[in-house]
Amino acid sequence: MWKMMIIDDEYFVRMGIRETIDWAVHGVEIVGEADNGTQGLELACRLKPDIIITDIRMPGMNGLDFMRCCREKGLHSQIIVLSAHEEFN
């Protein structure tokens, strides 16, 4: 089974990702959720997920900084960005 994490500051977005798809049918287990990049990084370092779905705009550490820190820490998770954010600088 693939291990997956969801990181988004919006509870209903996390719930939608978690409950809209029957992840187990696709061989995916949701092993953790976080509502900001800092918490997400701590969980990712501990859980070592195969897949991470993250938002960009979040309080504290944003998604871009989160992805940079993941690479610096040697995490090899595949990261999928889902965001309504319009501008990336």
Predicted regions and their residues:
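Non-catalytic signal-transmission and effector/linker regions of two-component phosphorelay proteins
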Residues: 1-3
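Conserved sequence signature across two-component system core domains
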Residues: 7-8, 34, 52
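Generic detector of well-ordered alpha-helical packing
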Residues: 9-11, 56
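Two-component/phosphorelay signaling modules centered on CheY-like receiver
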Residues: 11-32
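CheY-like receiver
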Residues: 41-42, 46-89
